[in-house]
């Protein structure tokens, strides 16, 4: 399988005509934001980013030297000793400072009567708005919106937070400027820090509960893992949803579109 993956990488690099990566990003950094998973989809992205097949070959050989490396289907998941899984690093054409975002964000007291203080985004409304203002079709609007969510969840400018598992937030909450002046801000920031600190361990442990092409990710056991990994310090009952959105927006799901959620790929799952 390793040989096939290397051949695929060579072909892809030839097609793109680029063998030089960005000077400030190593291959390991790049793969880390792809879930430390080397396979068909990430090879395409690595080639587009200018990472050469020699570096990919060397990384796979390094992984071959440890029993911790996971091989599943056409994928290789590098061990934590070589690569730590980070939240997906993606960038959307929709920016949090764009006028469409501002127009579809509530006032900070817009949901006060319901007990929620914060600036909440009308996500479906935003997807409809950018189709009009930018001439995008539904699939392009969905792609950029999911990337927008993943990007800003990663930076901490968005959250989907409540400490009550029986309560659903009004929407994604913007946490910039005056919108960050909310009673739960310290708890939100702590939950974000815990999520990112434990991201590698949570993704790797949960993958054992998810069969690629059949199951959903994260699994129903994810929040139990969060409780154990954070020793009960996490207060966000919806961390599982944040992680799902981050991985979908980061391209860790195959076949996502405006009408289809798609299915997870490694490192989120294992093939039978």
Give the location of each predicted region.
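A cross-kingdom marker for long, charged
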Residues: 227-272
